[in-house]
Structures are given as C-alpha cells and as structure tokens.
Amino acid sequence: MPRANEIKKGMVLNYNGKLLLAKDIDIQSPTARGAATLYKMRFSDVRTGLKVEERFKGDDIVDTVTLTRRYVDFSYVDGNEYVFMDKEDYTPYTFTKDQIEEELLFMPEGGMPDMQVLTWDGQLLALELPQTVDLEIVETAPGIKGASASARNKPATLSTGLVIQVPEYLSPGEKIRIHIEERRYMGRAD
C-alpha cells in the first residue's frame, strides 16, 4: 500500500469505509524540526458526491483502489448532462454539470484529445483531462509594447470562462497553453 506522500490527483482511496477521489492536494511543510510534512487533501466522495477534506502525514499508509481508465471523446450536451463516448466500444458515459464543473473550465467547445473516464466496479467516478490544454484569450487588458522584458502579469479571461494570470505582452485573440492541474500559463500555443 502506498504512503500519503505518493498520492496524486485522480487517485481513489478507501478511507474510513468511503471511496474518496483525490481532487486537490496541498503540501504543508513544517517549520519545527522533526515535524512531519502534512498533506491536506480535498476529495470527492464517490458514492455521495460530497466534498471531504482530510489531513495525512507523509508516511501514513493509505489504501488505494485500482480504477479502470477509458479514453473518451466529448459527444453532446443534453440539458444539464454531458455525454462522452468511449473511443473503443462507443459506450456512452453521462456526467451532470455539477460532477464535472471544474473540468468544464478547461474544456474547449467540442472537447479535447486524451480525455479519460475513471470507473470502478462498473460505477462511473470521474472525468480526467490531459495535463495541458490550448485555449484562446478572449478578454484582457491591451498588450503593452516593449513589456516582454518585465515579469509582470495581468488577468486574462479565456474562451471557456476561466480567468488566469498571463504575461503583460499577451493580447486578446492569442492562443495559449495552460497547465490544467496548476491553472498556470505555460506559453503560447503552436
């Protein structure tokens, strides 16, 4: 069984009789000597959908669950439901808007390549996105000529409604690459 410091976003733990899907992990390093590093993890309870927060020491042993991952394509929206189609056997997977609210901030219209659904024992758990996505800037303050030497940032609204910090020299209409997990600008898209 792995230790708490080996847990990554998207893994599922069997903890206190609950199946918990890791959504976010904060690492808190201690200032006192001999104190253990704490891992504050935010989970989504697979069965109830409720948000759960737990703290672990780095060397705590946790019980993980092996998931089935299937590559999918975005198919269509039906009211409040988003339907994804399995790339191999064309099985439809349906999520409500609430279940994938975070993921929708990074998903361009028409979907994106390398999306996966996570299932366990025939139960649909989560939608997993690739590490990066290319999105277009739709709104930001105008670019400042000669600002490429400065390291200042400004907020930019992207085509999906997501707001992130970008360098000052970028302007609306440009496509940029975003690191999804860290919600950070990586560079201009090819």
Curated annotation (Swiss-Prot):
Xref: PANTHER family: ELONGATION FACTOR P (PTHR30053), TRANSLATION ELONGATION FACTOR KOW-LIKE DOMAIN-CONTAINING PROTEIN (PTHR30053:SF14)
InterPro entries the record matches: Elong-fact-P_C (IPR015365), NA-bd_OB-fold (IPR012340), Rib_uL2_dom2 (IPR014722), Transl_elong_fac_P/YeiP (IPR020599), Transl_elong_KOW-like (IPR013185), Transl_elong_p-like_YeiP (IPR011897), Transl_elong_P/YeiP_cen (IPR001059), Transl_elong_P/YeiP_CS (IPR013852)
Name under which the protein is recorded: Elongation factor P-like protein
SMART domains to which the protein is assigned, alphabetical: EFP, Elong-fact-P_C
GO cellular component: cytosol
One GO term of the biological process aspect: peptide biosynthetic process
Cleavable signal peptide: none
Family: Belongs to the elongation factor P family.
GO molecular-function term, one example from the UniProt record: translation elongation factor activity
SUPFAM superfamilies xref list: Nucleic acid-binding proteins (SSF50249), Translation proteins SH3-like domain (SSF50104)
Annotated source species: Shigella flexneri
